[in-house]
Amino acid sequence: MPDKEKVCTGGDLAEVLSRTRLSAEEAIAWKSDLEAAHKDSSATMTANEMVEYWSSIGSEMVHADDKPYLRADKFQTQLYPVPWAGPILSADVFLLFLNPGYVSHEDEYEKQPKLARLLRDNLKGDQPYFYLQEEFRNHPGYDWAHRTFGDGIKEYLSRICVLQLVAYHSTDGGEARKVAASLPSSKKTIKFVQDSVLARARLGKVGLVIARSSSLWGLDRVHEEKNIIIYRGGECRRAYQTPASRGGELIRQILARN
């Protein structure tokens, strides 16, 4: 039976394959792409470079680099991408998740001009975490965020950033796991986390909660420290950040002291 921690982080290849239905050939390619993504030794990726990279998307819903890798029948490419939610340029706390989910009536909400503008402005990197803003109260993302974070967070939306390994919405997280290692935009995000966020967390400058898929983020061998929490086992199934959770406790400690 796969190790509980590995099942959570994605570290057990057999478990990941059973969930995503990869063929043997796809499994080999998946592993190769994942290793390549984590061994990229090019220049450090900064938050400003992340914003610049995503600014090139213009009015499109899919980054040009990603188009060869995404299937429209697996991802909701009619929705705005969410590589991050919150001020990636200045956040005091970063939370790592897999990819944004999807419910059928989400499309109608995102056609509303005000919400569409908020979603597009999010890519500027200086906007508050939007899913808990009043404009999103009727959006399905609001319900998810409220259940995930619980109370006592709304006053800190300008200091929290949720990073998604895969920026595109899907109903099945298994599809995101399949493409994460090969998707160019995901490689950028992985590099940003490893180069910038992790280093700053170790220096005590930001908090880091690895809530989902630590192996796919290339962080499964990172040790927990004062400002770094890695969810394991049952923690990462729903990845709560409520006051009673380990991540939620760290988040509130950091936000309260700054």
What kind of region is each of these model predictions?
Residues P113-G173:
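Low-complexity, serine/threonine/proline-enriched polar segments
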Residues M1-L132, S196, D220-I228, N258:
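Active-site and ligand/interface coordination hotspots across diverse enzymes
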Residues P2-L34, H38, S42, S158, ...:
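Glycine/proline-rich loop-helix segments at beta-alpha junctions forming the active-site rim
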Residues Y69-W84, P140-F149, L183-L198:
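A Trp-anchored, charged/polar loop motif used as the substrate-binding/catalytic surface
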